[in-house]
Amino acid sequence: MSEESMDTGFLVINTKDKQDKTVKKPLRILIKKSLENYFLHLDKSQCVSNLYQLVLSELEQPLLDIIMQHTRGNQTRAASIMGINRSTLRKKLKRYGMN
């Protein structure tokens, strides 16, 4: 599925603005702010080498949890929803102790 045809309209989080009003922010904006915060507070002498895996695991575990709940544990359906192979799904579930 191409990026243009994917519906990301529901990937939003309700947050509060400076006037304490509820506003919807796309998930990607919150991820970007989290990464900016990470680098802002990073000790300048630290060498970051696994940031991609760190970010991926922060997103992947709750994604798997929600999809497995949604499919009531049906791995075939879950893999289909995610667009991955069932064996790949099983590896990911095992990695996070969700098997």
From Swiss-Prot:
- DNA-binding region location: 75-94
Record keywords, A-Z: Activator, DNA-binding, Transcription, Transcription regulation
Q: Which GO terms describe its molecular function?
A: DNA-binding transcription factor activity; sequence-specific DNA binding
Please give the SUPFAM superfamilies that the UniProt record associates with this protein: Homeodomain-like (SSF46689)
Using the record, list the residue span of the signal peptide; answer none if the entry has no such feature.
none
Disulphide linkage map: none
Q: PANTHER family annotated for this entry?
A: DNA-BINDING PROTEIN FIS
HAMAP family, alphabetically?
DNA_binding_Fis
Q: Give the similarity note.
A: Belongs to the transcriptional regulatory Fis family.
* Assembly, per entry: Homodimer.
Primary role: Activates ribosomal RNA transcription. Plays a direct role in upstream activation of rRNA promoters.
Its name, as the record gives it, is DNA-binding protein Fis
Q: Which organism is it from?
A: Buchnera aphidicola subsp. Schizaphis graminum (strain Sg)
Q: Its encoding gene is what?
A: fis
